Amino acid sequence: MAKHGYSVCINYISNDEAAENVKNQILESGGRCIVVKADVSSAKDVIRLFETVDVELGRASVLVNNAAILMTQCRLEEISAERFSEVLRRNVLSCFLCSKEAVKRMSIKYGGAGGTIVNVSSAAAKSGSPNEYIDYAASKGAVDTLTRGLAVEVAAEGIRVNAVRPGLIYTEMHAAGGEPDRVERLKSRIPLQRGGQASEIAEAILWLATDKSSFVTGGFIDAAGGL
């Protein structure tokens, strides 16, 4: 986003070093960037996050909801109520809270100039992730429904809402599920016969965030290699 002239706010919850590294890369390339440590599943933290952006960067025009957690692989009967609630809180409530604050700033109804919201869902929303992460899949299904409903709700207010559904991507998230090499194990099932890269997902997000997708709202990009 910074390469395309956007001022960027990096939100994070724990990894100070990683956030600062990305910030420094953006600043060194001539971009404008701030970092804000906040738990986006906390209403109080989300309000503080957006108020900080208001003061330091101006009203948000693009929101990318990509906060999510993945827990250890298991069957549904092994998932505790506490785990299920935590996954929904981190993966769905965060999306709701951030979208709520974004709409207040983007909507022409509230004096805004419009904007775009891009939610990062998952191919798991369609597959259900049986025997692995039904809780994660269910949370992403909720993100899909939120995407579609909000897109229609705010379409006449200058806001577009879309989502990207990544498939098997080489990220650190698989380690959280207990299988760092999961993509390697499953890539033969992918029609393109390989796992995806985070940079490929970023390109899909960028397209939805910019005016290049100006006639697209309530839509989904399945970036899953054919799955």
What are these language model-derived features?
Residues 155, 160, 216-218:
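Short, small/polar-rich loop/turn modules that mediate ligand/substrate recognition or access, typified
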Residues 73, 205-206, 217-227:
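Short C-terminal tail/terminal secondary-structure segment
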Residues 74-76, 80-85, 186:
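Substrate-binding pocket helix/loop in short-chain dehydrogenase/reductase
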Residues 104, 152-153, 214:
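Alpha-helical segment proximal to the catalytic Tyr-Lys
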Residues 190-201:
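A conserved structural motif in NAD(P)-dependent oxidoreductases
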Residues 16-17, 37-49, 81, 199:
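The beta1-alpha1 cofactor-binding region of Rossmann-like NAD(H)/NADP(H)-dependent oxidoreductases
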Residues 69, 112, 118-142, 147-156, ...:
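Catalytic loop of short-chain dehydrogenase/reductase
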